[in-house]
Curated annotation (Swiss-Prot):
Pfam families tied to this protein: Dala_Dala_lig_C (PF07478), Dala_Dala_lig_N (PF01820)
Protein name: D-alanine--D-alanine ligase B
InterPro entries: ATP-grasp, ATP_grasp_subdomain_1, D-Ala_lig_Van_CS, D_ala_D_ala, Dala_Dala_lig_C, Dala_Dala_lig_N, PreATP-grasp_dom_sf
UniProt entry keywords in alphabetical sequence: ATP-binding, Cell shape, Cell wall biogenesis/degradation, Cytoplasm, Ligase, Magnesium, Manganese, Metal-binding, Nucleotide-binding, Peptidoglycan synthesis
Organism the protein comes from: Bacillus cereus (strain ATCC 14579 / DSM 31 / CCUG 7414 / JCM 2152 / NBRC 15305 / NCIMB 9373 / NCTC 2599 / NRRL B-3711)
Gene label: ddlB
Length: 361
C-alpha cells in the first residue's frame, strides 16, 4: 500500500506556539506510520520555516519537535520549492498538509491562503472560515446574521481606546454591565481573557487584552453551563455527542486548558434530548454560516431555563491530552487515530472537489 506523505505543520509565530507543539506531539503518537509518512514542518517563534527529516518511530517530547538551526530556515516565499514541493515526481513531495497551528499567523486564514495558492490539499477550514473564526467580532456578526442566540457584546480598537478610555469603559457599563468578559478579538486558548466585576478590573483587563491584539471584544456574562460539541465534515457535516466543561476556577482559562488540567469534562453531558438537538442544530448552522470545512468545535452556554447561547466556534481545536474535541468524537464512536484519518480524507475530498471549478471563460 502506498503511504500518504503527510506534512505536519506546527509551531507558529503566535502566543499559542506551545499549544501547537503539544497538539503536534499528540497527533504524531496517534498516526499509523504504516499508512502515513510523517514529515515535520516547524514554524519557529520568529516565523522561520524549517522542514525536518521524516519521522520514524516514537516521539516522546515536544522539545524534539523544535528543529533548530537558522541555516535550515527559509522564508515562506520559497515554500513551494524548498519546504512543501507537491509535484508527484519529486522525492520530497507532500500529498497533504495537516496544519496544527493555533492563533494568529496560523489558524486565521494566512497559512490557509498560502496553501491555496500552492494548490495542495490541507486539513481543516479554508481562508474564509479560518479568518472569520479567528476574529471574535466578525464571527459574532456572522452568527447574528444567521439568527443564532448569543450574549450581547461590544468591540473596541486600541487607537480609539487610547484617545478616550472613559468612553470605552462607560459603554461597557451602560450596554453590558458587570460581570463581563474582556477578550482579545483574535486569539484563542483563553489567552488574555479576564472576567471583570468592577471598573478597576475592567481597566486592567483592557490593558492586558490590548497587549495581544489591536482589537478586543467585551461580552456580557451568561450564567449557564459550558457545553461543547464537535462538528465534522464538509458539505454535509455531522455532530458528536455534547460534552460539558466544569472548571474548578471561575471560568475555563489557559492554565486550566493546557497546564494543570484542573477541569472536569463530562461526556456526554446530562441534558434533555431537546436541548442536545438545539445545540447540534445551532452548531451546524454556525459551521455552514462560516462555510466550514473539515472540523470545528462549537462552544455554548446552556442556562437553567434551557436557553442555548452560542459562545464561539474554534476552527482548529487542540488535540492535546486535555482537549475536548477528540474526546467528544471518541465517545461518539470515532477513536482519535480514526478521527485524524477522517480529517485527512476530508481534506483530500475537498481538494478534489475544488479541482472541478472552472477558472476560464
Amino acid at each position: 500500500m502506498t503511504k500518504i506523505k503527510l506534512g505536519l505543520l506546527y509551531g507558529g509565530k503566535s502566543a499559542e506556539h506551545q499549544v501547537s507543539l503539544q497538539t503536534a506531539l499528540a497527533a504524531i503518537k496517534a498516526l499509523n506510520q504504516d499508512k502515513f509518512e510523517i514529515h515535520p514542518i516547524y514554524i519557529t517563534e520568529q516565523g522561520q520555516w524549517v522542514r525536518g527529516e521524516r519521522i520514524e518511530g516514537e516521539v516522546t517530547d515536544v522539545e524534539a519537535l523544535k528543529m533548530s538551526g537558522a541555516e535550515n530556515a527559509i522564508s515562506p516565499l520559497s515554500l513551494s520549492t524548498e519546504i512543501i514541493p507537491s509535484a508527484a515526481s519529486e522525492e520530497n513531495a507532500i500529498d497533504v498538509i495537516f496544519p496544527l497551528l493555533h492563533g494568529p499567523n496560523g489558524e486565521d486564514g494566512t497559512v490557509q491562503g498560502l496553501l491555496e495558492l500552492m494548490n495542495i490539499p490541507y486539513v481543516g477550514n479554508g481562508v474564509l472560515a479560518s479568518s472569520a473564526g479567528m476574529d471574535k467580532v466578525v464571527m459574532k456578526n456572522i452568527f447574528a446574521e444567521a439568527g443564532l442566540k448569543q450574549a450581547k457584546y461590544a468591540s473596541f480598537i486600541r487607537s480609539a481606546w487610547e484617545k478616550n478610555r472613559e468612553e470605552a469603559y462607560s459603554k461597557v457599563e451602560d450596554k453590558l454591565g458587570y460581570p463581563c468578559f474582556v477578550k482579545p478579538a483574535n486569539l484563542g486558548s483563553s489567552v488574555g481573557i479576564n472576567k471583570c466585576k468592577n471598573r478597576e478590573e475592567l481597566e486592567d483587563a483592557f490593558v492586558e487584552a490590548f497587549q495581544f491584539d489591536r482589537k478586543i471584544i467585551v461580552e456580557e456574562n451568561i450564567v449557564g453551563r459550558e457545553v461543547e460539541v464537535g462538528v465534522l465534515g464538509n458539505d454535509e457535516p455531522k455532530c458528536s455527542v455534547v460534552g460539558e466543561i466544569v472548571p474548578k476556577k471561575d471560568f475555563y482559562d489557559y492554565k486550566s486548558k493546557y497546564i494543570d488540567g484542573d477541569t472536569a469534562l463530562i461526556i456526554p453531558a446530562e441534558m434533555t434530548e431537546e436541548e442536545s438537538n438545539v445545540i447540534k442544530r445551532d452548531a451546524i448552522i454556525a459551521f455552514q454560516s462560516l462555510d466550514g470545512a473539515g472540523l470545528t468545535r462549537a462552544d455554548f452556554f446552556l442556562t437553567k431555563d434551557g436557553e442555548v447561547y452560542i459562545n464561539e466556534v474554534n476552527t482548529m481545536p487542540g488535540f492535546t491530552p486535555f482537549s475536548m474535541f477528540p474526546l467528544l468524537w471518541q465517545h461518539t464512536g470515532l477513536p482519535y487515530p480514526e478521527l485524524i484519518e477522517e480529517l485527512i480524507r476530508l481534506a483530500i475530498e475537498r481538494h478534489e472537489e475544488k479541482q472541478k471549478i472552472k477558472y476560464t471563460i
